[in-house]
């Protein structure tokens, strides 16, 4: 970097969550973006891989995983942190980092865990803080806050793990679902991403298996009424001033937008989405309002439902560490808005330094 020191980016990826492989794919994209010609004068990058057991690998070993994923990710020779080594933040690998870029999707990362840990390094990080991350991960708490702000959402019910352990209580739950919601309904673990653990339920007999599946991932369970909708998404970047991207739509071919649809299907991505300008404006306004409500800044992707019959907007959820894979909407939205991936990652670092 002419006239100054290059910023060293600490890219953290992997993690002991169900979204481990998605995180690796996202990290590959971001790693290459920082290595690009337009960024090499400004940045150096160090990769830090966390395996599925929660052990951190050294930067050289981590980089090899991003270059050659066939490397054995769980037996790489050098570990810089494990359960017996708690002073890892003093390690040489960490001392040289100027800005952290966590790309841990799901629990133990996107939920604010990594943000709390990295706070002790006293180095800036890309993305929002602990509170915004935790609220963005917890679908139920998110919905409660949105309800208080009168932000439109689909009808929903909330249950806890222990509710399913008593037969009488369980029967009451089923009765409540049948009384208050119309089929189909979607049963979701409150703390999960990439549609993992979610089931589409079309009749009474499918309710209990779906609840059991969801509580296998998280003890808090969300049940939402399903509507005939379009999947609409909006990107957010910024701090004191939040900027919105073009609006995008995912036109998926499967019955609903599940994990396979997100990462293993040839979905049609439409950017900008073919919607009325008034609806687009309202979606952007709700996106900013919802991020402000949860103290979310840095970057995020805000997901909406647009009911096909009425064009009514429903806020679905906010993703505080959206995917950066080849199929991910977030970088596509910003590319359509004038920021290529190389420019986007640099912009996110600049935002983190502007706090």
Curated annotation (Swiss-Prot):
As cofactor, the record names:
Mg(2+); Mn(2+)
Keywords recorded for this protein, A-Z = ATP-binding, Cell shape, Cell wall biogenesis/degradation, Cytoplasm, Ligase, Magnesium, Manganese, Metal-binding, Nucleotide-binding, Peptidoglycan synthesis
Q: Is Manganese given among the entry's keywords?
A: yes
By its UniProt entry, which InterPro entries does this protein fall under? ATP-grasp, ATP_grasp_subdomain_1, D-Ala_lig_Van_CS, D_ala_D_ala, Dala_Dala_lig_C, Dala_Dala_lig_N, PreATP-grasp_dom_sf
**Which residues of this UniProt protein bind Mg(2+) 1?**
303, 317
Q: What is its main location?
A: cytoplasm
Any idea which GO molecular function terms this record carries?
A: ATP binding; D-alanine-D-alanine ligase activity; metal ion binding
Binding positions for ATP per the UniProt entry: 178-233
Q: What class of enzyme is it?
A: ligase
- Give an example GO biological process: peptidoglycan biosynthetic process
The answer to whether the entry has keyword Phosphoprotein is no
Give the cofactor note. Binds 2 magnesium or manganese ions per subunit.
Q: Which residues bind Mg(2+) 2?
A: 317, 319
| SUPFAM superfamilies named in the record | Glutathione synthetase ATP-binding domain-like (SSF56059), PreATP-grasp domain (SSF52440)
The compartments listed are:
Cytoplasm
Pfam families tied to this protein: Dala_Dala_lig_C, Dala_Dala_lig_N
Pathway listed for it? Cell wall biogenesis; peptidoglycan biosynthesis
* GO cellular component terms attached to this protein's record: cytosol
Which EC number(s) does UniProt give?
6.3.2.4
Regarding protein family, the annotation reads: Belongs to the D-alanine--D-alanine ligase family.
Function recorded in the entry: Cell wall formation.
Would you tell me the protein name for this molecule? D-alanine--D-alanine ligase
Q: What species is this protein from? A: Prochlorococcus marinus (strain AS9601)
Q: Give the classification, highest ranks.
A: Bacteria, Bacillati, Cyanobacteriota, Cyanophyceae, Synechococcales
Its encoding gene is what? ddl
